[in-house]
């Protein structure tokens, strides 16, 4: 049994990961700022804390055998709101972790580091990050591999579906967003559509990580289940949920990522096999909508960009409006 500190463990990935880590017999402690949540409801030890508060975080590193570092500002638009804060959270904290913690490090990166490429890319493929988010993840990878080459890094495909029943669901991810638009609006705009994305059910992040908590595998692994075009994903959604019309828009779109990724290494070396599918993700999100759990797609809570804007761009908040501003972001949010 290992003592596992899940940093940033109260979010979209962390909920299901925490459950599966406990089920595997490990002792779990979650450290999280609760940026997107009002309270933590799971029955594991929880510490409310900021990843930029190194003095507060340090004793919990001393306790842990393994750290799963989920804490990050995630997504291209959200990270672009305030590059300075993004770098502090997504890169500088990783440098500090590698210099401070002597145990096992498991770090989720992103397949977005590949950018735009027509080839099927393995872990040795050329990287071409097209956003601040991807640049930061690639730099964090470099820091880890330089300082702690015994660590394990997973480059995650685009996630989809529902994790656990407690944690906030992200509806700004392509599958979840298109299902929501099909069910609530009946109209799916697809810009271009021929661009490829690697896909992975959010629960399968835990499928990959949990067996490696007390293992010794190291290096960088692509983690995903399939590659498909945005247009094909939209067509699957319309057919599966029985709602929505697709509009193909042949105009330039700000997201120029286009890449197909090989998952052979993670299967061959770590024995990873996905337990969930994109169709499972479609069904889960459709069920939430059908049962009234998701009604208003304009709510900021569903989007990292809209949730983070009040904290990263405080000058844009109308006068007289009070916001709950976590101290890490209020302290560091300033000129961009």
What label would you give each PLM region?
Residues 79, 157-167, 174-200, 222:
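A conserved pocket-lining segment of Rossmann-fold NAD(P)-dependent short-chain dehydrogenase/reductase
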Residues 109-110, 141-164:
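Conserved beta-loop-beta element that borders a ligand/cofactor-binding pocket
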């Amino acid at each position: 049994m290992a003592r596992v500190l899940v940093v940033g463990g109260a979010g979209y990935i962390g909920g299901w990961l925490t459950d599966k880590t406990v089920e595997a017999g490990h002792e779990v402690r979650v450290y999280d700022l609760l940026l997107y949540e009002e309270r933590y409801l799971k029955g594991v030890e929880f510490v409310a804390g900021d990843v930029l508060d190194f003095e507060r975080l340090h004793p919990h590193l001393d306790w842990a055998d393994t750290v799963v570092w989920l804490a990050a500002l995630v997504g291209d638009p959200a990270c672009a709101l305030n590059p300075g804060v993004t770098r502090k959270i997504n890169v500088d904290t990783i440098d500090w972790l590698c210099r401070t913690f002597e145990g096992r490090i498991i770090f989720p990166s992103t397949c977005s580091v590949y950018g735009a490429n027509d080839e099927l890319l393995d872990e040795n493929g050329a990287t071409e990050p097209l956003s601040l988010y991807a640049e930061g993840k690639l730099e964090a990878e470099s820091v880890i591999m330089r300082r702690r080459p015994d660590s394990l890094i997973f480059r995650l495909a685009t996630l989809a579906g529902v994790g656990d029943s407690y944690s906030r669901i992200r509806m700004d991810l392509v599958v979840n967003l298109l299902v929501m638009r099909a069910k609530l609006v009946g109209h799916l705009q697809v810009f271009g559509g021929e661009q490829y994305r690697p896909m992975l059910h959010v629960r399968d992040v835990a499928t990959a990580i949990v067996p490696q908590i007390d293992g010794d595998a190291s290096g960088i692994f692509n983690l995903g289940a399939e590659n498909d075009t945005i247009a094909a994903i939209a067509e699957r959604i319309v057919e599966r949920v029985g709602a929505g019309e697709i509009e193909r828009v042949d105009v330039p779109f700000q997201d120029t990522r286009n890449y197909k990724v090989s998952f052979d290494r993670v299967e061959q070396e770590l024995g990873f096999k996905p337990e969930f599918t994109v169709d499972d993700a479609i069904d889960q999100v459709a069920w939430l909508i059908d049962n009234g759990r998701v009604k208003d797609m304009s709510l900021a809570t569903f989007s990292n960009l809209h949730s983070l804007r009040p904290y990263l761009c405080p000058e844009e908040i109308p006068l007289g409006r009070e916001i709950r501003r976590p101290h890490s972001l209020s302290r560091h949010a300033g000129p961009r």
